[in-house]
Every structure is written in structure tokens, then in C-alpha cells.
Amino acid sequence: MAGGKGGKGMGKVGAKRHSKRSNKASIEGITKPAIRRLARRGGVKRISSFIYDDSRQVLKSFLENVVRDAVTYTEHARRKTVTAMDVVYALKRQGRTLYGFGG
């Protein structure tokens, strides 16, 4: 018999990864109240209704850059799991040092 749990497979099978959501659906997951809460935390009192789409695009590009750098650190270390330190180093590389997570 071949390897694997079922007995009829052809060798080892890697772990199933999450299916990728479409970009439009995932960016719309950042709701207006979530953007409003972020703005409140930053000290904003009133928010124009035109700001939400722009905020989503800016947040998307920022996170894409951070995640790309964090994954680069992870791949260089030959790991499959992105650690908090990978994210800290990615932010530091972009000039946004984050304290409180080691390193």
C-alpha cells in the first residue's frame, strides 16, 4: 500500500491551506465602523463619508508591504509559520519600529 491515511493515495500529502478570498471581498471586510474606531483611536472627531474607500486602499497597501516583508523573513529562516518577530522586523525595515514584542 502507498503512504497516506487512506491507503490509496500516492505518498504524503501536504497540509491543506486556506482558500484565498477575492481581494474585493476581503477589503470590504474592513467595515465603516472599524475605520471609524481606528480614526477615533488616532484622535479624529468627525469623518467625511468619502474617506472610507481611500482608507481601505491605504490600509491594504500598507498591510501588503508588511506581510510581504514578514513572509520574506519567514522563508529565509526556512519556516512555514510567520512569527511575531518576523512582523516586528518587517515593520522595523519600513521605519516603523514596534516595541513590546521582543527583539
Curated annotation (Swiss-Prot):
> Whom does it interact with, and what assembly results?
The nucleosome is a histone octamer containing two molecules each of H2A, H2B, H3 and H4 assembled in one H3-H4 heterotetramer and two H2A-H2B heterodimers. The octamer wraps approximately 147 bp of DNA.
Q: Which organism is it from?
A: Tetrahymena pyriformis
Compositionally biased intervals (Gly residues): 1-12
Q: Which family does it belong to?
A: Belongs to the histone H4 family.
What protein name is recorded for this chain? Answer: Histone H4, major
What PROSITE patterns does this protein's entry cite? HISTONE_H4
Q: What does this protein do?
A: Core component of nucleosome. Nucleosomes wrap and compact DNA into chromatin, limiting DNA accessibility to the cellular machineries which require DNA as a template. Histones thereby play a central role in transcription regulation, DNA repair, DNA replication and chromosomal stability. DNA accessibility is regulated via a complex set of post-translational modifications of histones, also called histone code, and nucleosome remodeling.
Q: Which InterPro entries match?
A: CENP-T/H4_C (IPR035425), Histone-fold (IPR009072), Histone_H4 (IPR001951), Histone_H4_CS (IPR019809)
- Keyword line: Acetylation, Chromosome, DNA-binding, Nucleosome core, Nucleus
List the signal peptide residues: none
Q: Which residues carry this modification: N6-acetyllysine?
A: K5, K8, K12, K16
Compositional bias of kind Basic residues: 14-23
Under the heading Pfam families, the entry gives: CENP-T_C
- Its main subcellular localisation, reduced to a broad class, is nucleus
Q: Any idea where this protein resides?
A: Nucleus; Chromosome
Region annotated Disordered sits at 1-29
The Swiss-Prot or TrEMBL record marks DNA binding at: 16-21
Entry GO CC: nucleosome; nucleus
Task: Show the taxonomic lineage.
Answer: Eukaryota, Sar, Alveolata, Ciliophora, Intramacronucleata
UniProt GO MF annotations: DNA binding; protein heterodimerization activity; structural constituent of chromatin
Q: Which stretches are annotated as coiled coil?
A: none
